[in-house]
Amino acid sequence: MEQYNALLRYVFQVTEQELSSIGWQEREIIRAKFPTMEKADVIGWFDDDTLVSQVAVYPMEVRIFGKTYAMGGLTGVGTYPEYSNMGLMHRLLEQALKNMKKKGQHICYLYPYSIPYYRRKGWEIISDKISYEIKDYQLPKNRQVPGDVRRVKTDSEELKETYERYAMHTHGAVLRDELAWNEYWLWDSDDVMAAVYYNEKNEPDGYVIYWIANDVFHIKDMIFNNEDARTGLWNFVSAHFSMIDRVEGDTYTDEPLAFLLEDASIKEVISPYFMGRIVDFEAFVEEYPFRPSVLDREWKFTLMDPVMECNQGSFLLTISRDGHGEAKRIMEPCRDRISIQTMTTMLMGYKRPEYLAKIGRIQASEWTIDMLEDAIEQQTPYISDYF
């Protein structure tokens, strides 16, 4: 564990000063990470007794268009510079993906330190983060709602229940067990607080996780199941008007905040957040909920994958009228072509087939693109986790 932590700190240049700024000491990190690492699949290369390259995969679950998938959360990726360009990481990633395949983890998420690098290995962007800044005078005015907001402890069951209710109907969301919650809070300071919106039936319908420092109200995340919850939570934020100069926060949906505000001239910055990768295409499609149709549908194409052999070659994708998909390998050349990166971002709903064809990421007929547009749900992933 000490070598794992030392390698990550060296590669990502984490200093003692940076650790102490959020209240961490070296030994505390090791203790905090130990329960998570016990459940993780950690593999590495050693030079004698020295760990020189490593990856870790957390066993997780995610919701994809109403279905629960086992997911491998890739993290802890690092190689000492003197051991780079030896192919060590490529082989570790290949082994990690093979291990995921054996465990039935048909999709992999990661937070990238280098988008180009992971694209070369088969991952693609699947979600965004919108960072915003709202001046105190731009905050929404109080509006009456049937529920109320109560502050709770960040480790409370109320907070976990609120997230679970939200995640179960939210495409892309990680279903958080203790491992996922531990990772979610790991790098936050002790000043982080939480408030939950309860509806008129006393059910939790949303929360805001925040901290206040130097006259700034920082929002780590805000989730809500309906408009009443959204309004109630912003009422709570606006109630801090006399204490703050501005609000800074992040949101992980594809809906910019500006349109919802009376004074919409706020600062918003959209940036890529998580990347994803289909691990086993045939198995992924077997569980995937396509849209129903009055007709059966099919598509023959060549799939390209830079790492996983099981995803390389020609396939026939059939989609039944009730939306059940099946992918089978075929032994014939196909004119249509798509990479595993593009297949992932398309089936996850981050980018639409028509757009991907327009920019040359899919080679297929207009009829096929129209069929895919009709077959794939229109919803972009929400991912607010970090691991």
What are these model-derived regions, one by one?
Residues 93, 98-112, 242-252:
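Conserved GNAT acetyl-CoA-binding A-motif
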Residues 40-44, 54, 76, 192-196, ...:
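Short hydrophobic/aromatic beta-strand element in the GNAT-like acyltransferase core
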Residues 123-142, 226-387:
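Active-site/acyl-donor-binding loops of N-acyltransferases
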